[in-house]
């Protein structure tokens, strides 16, 4: 490995809180400790496709305000597969070589990529093809990246979902209503389960546990019989019935995305129990806003650790969090495993111990 003089950093995939804390940390440590230059690549790999590349020099005197900012000031994208990138003329083209050329044009010696499992898989494939020295940092509100106990963005998203449930609690009790809250998470129920327990949900539905609508309605009837005429239902967007049925929405270009399950569950509850029911879809509110103190801390820790991995020449690795410590794991390990809720884990046991219905009672 040659001497490191200039590194790049980019954010890829969906945004979340805590990304700017990572960028700030990388800049402070790379410049202050090692004397390297740091280049921020804008709009993920799409910034490297441009000629010249879309990038800015980052300095310690222009990044301190980033710590408490949500989103990513570098910009990001979760659209446009670089291996089959849609062109203006309607065709698709593999832009891998353009991305590699952009990396070389900037004179980078290493690259820090902040992303979820999909983004890290793409970056790794490009790095292997182009000989790019890559270090990964996991981020996703879904907390589904393998090999790490937690990813950047999850804590803030969970806090937001918990606060939403707190607010719905008061209006549900005031009107004797069933309030259904739909949250993100893709095929992992981490947000729904953690926020549901923290926010006092009576029913929590997650993708890992197929639900029966009759079980849900029985819980509501039980509460009614006990004189509790309101109910809080937390629903993860990708939940499925015992037959595997899910609710999805068709988006532009025919792509389907999770969404609409909250409305469906609310309608079923109203029809079967007669309870006045309302639904709230939290949506992208979970991604935005001021990062939680823990996401600021985790972002700062991950940024320093990623820079140290570069200094050690430990490429094709990702920073991970285990037992309240940072470790490094091969990126391949992280993208080949998918972290879902463990059915015999502490949170599921806690939910059942609290009498929370998980849809299969």
Swiss-Prot record:
Keywords: ATP-binding, Cytoplasm, Glycolysis, Kinase, Magnesium, Metal-binding, Nucleotide-binding, Transferase. ATP binds at residues 14, 79-80, 116-119. The keyword Cytoplasm applies. The active site is at residue 142. Catalyzes the phosphorylation of D-fructose 6-phosphate to fructose 1,6-bisphosphate by ATP, the first committing step of glycolysis. Belongs to the phosphofructokinase type A (PFKA) family. Mixed-substrate PFK group III subfamily. Homodimer or homotetramer. This is ATP-dependent 6-phosphofructokinase 1. It comes from Synechocystis sp. (strain ATCC 27184 / PCC 6803 / Kazusa).
